[in-house]
């Protein structure tokens, strides 16, 4: 697939005491929704914070909009919206103060649009008005909805969203998917979204491109359609498990049969076995790739 990059990175590094993010090359495709997937502590938040300019103590060269531009440049900041896992509102602010601060910080912030989004998302109305309660009183889900309202109320070209679905209920996760699709559609190929998620199944319908990270490094990346051709889901009977398992990246089995993920190029190795092939979903692919490098082991229960 031919595409342009909206963000590119070279030699991105950030060292901590017991962890190192090391991304030799990074490509975020323009006009698409990119999901960053990985275990807890894999480096997703660190990478997104670097891209959003929250962390400025990393090494490497990052280019936005096909040019080398400083994330501190006001024109670049104006074109990027960011939500993080930590509440970036002052705890004592109420809804009106949030709106006032966003209006001061970003020229494209539309206060009326913000009000409309807050109503549509059913955000607790008691935070608004002269005696509105502080945003610290909101539930985790409502705080995330409020953060989303601030970025969707701006005219941006990139949204960087760190775990936006995590605190949301199933209905709001579905709504978030609709909002991302609408945002991309309104940009007519010029807008892009980058988000991290553990809710792979819930967010699959809005994911075009994935980057799977483990221990600070990229394990796999590509358009979802391409990866669904690269990998194949294999299902078979119990009697073929021993022969099939050696060709599977991951495998789950019970007394009736097995299911696992393999490389499509290895389909011929299942010849003579009573197996069925199917298209894997994004969850199947992500877990298969992550399990190859994971330190997790099944405990004795």
What are these regions (language model features)?
Residues 1-25, 30-32, 73:
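A short, flexible loop at the N-terminus of ABC-type nucleotide-binding domains that lies
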Residues 37-39:
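The feature captures the beta-strand-to-loop junction immediately N-terminal to the Walker
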Residues 52:
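Helix-to-loop junction immediately C-terminal to a conserved catalytic motif
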Residues 60-71, 75-76:
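Conserved ABC transporter NBD signature motif
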Residues 84-146:
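ABC-family P-loop ATPase nucleotide-binding domains
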Residues 159-163:
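Catalytic Walker B motif of ABC-type/P-loop ATPase nucleotide-binding domains
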Residues 249-301:
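C-terminal coupling/interaction segments
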């Amino acid at each position: 697939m031919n595409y342009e990059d909206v963000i590119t990175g070279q030699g991105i590094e950030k060292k901590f005491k017991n962890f190192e993010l090391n991304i030799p090359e990074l490509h975020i495709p323009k006009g698409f929704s990119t999901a960053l997937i990985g275990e807890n502590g894999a480096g997703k938040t660190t990478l997104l914070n670097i891209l959003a300019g929250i962390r400025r103590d990393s090494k490497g060269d990052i280019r936005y909009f096909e040019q080398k531009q400083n994330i501190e440049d006001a024109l670049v900041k104006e074109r990027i919206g960011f939500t993080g896992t930590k509440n970036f509102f002052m705890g004592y602010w109420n809804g009106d103060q949030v709106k006032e601060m966003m209006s001061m910080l970003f020229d494209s912030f539309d206060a009326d649009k913000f009000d409309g989004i807050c109503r549509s998302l059913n955000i607790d109305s008691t935070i608004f008005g002269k005696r509105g309660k502080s945003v610290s009183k909101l539930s985790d889900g409502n705080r995330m909805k409020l953060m989303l309202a601030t970025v969707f109320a701006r005219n941006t070209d990139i949204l960087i969203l760190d775990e936006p679905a995590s605190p949301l209920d199933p209905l709001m996760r579905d709504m978030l998917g609709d909002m991302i699709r609408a945002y991309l559609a309104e940009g007519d190929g010029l807008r892009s979204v980058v988000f991290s998620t553990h809710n792979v199944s819930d967010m699959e319908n809005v994911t075009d491109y994935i980057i799977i990270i483990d221990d600070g490094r990229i394990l796999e990346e590509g358009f979802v359609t391409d990866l669904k051709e690269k990998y194949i889901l294999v299902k078979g009977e119990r009697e073929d498990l021993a022969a099939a398992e050696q060709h599977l990246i991951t495998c789950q089995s019970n007394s009736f049969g097995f299911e696992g993920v393999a490389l499509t190029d290895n389909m011929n190795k299942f010849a003579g076995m009573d197996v069925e092939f199917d298209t894997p979903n994004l969850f199947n692919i992500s877990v298969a790739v992550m399990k190859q490098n994971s330190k997790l082991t099944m405990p004795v229960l």
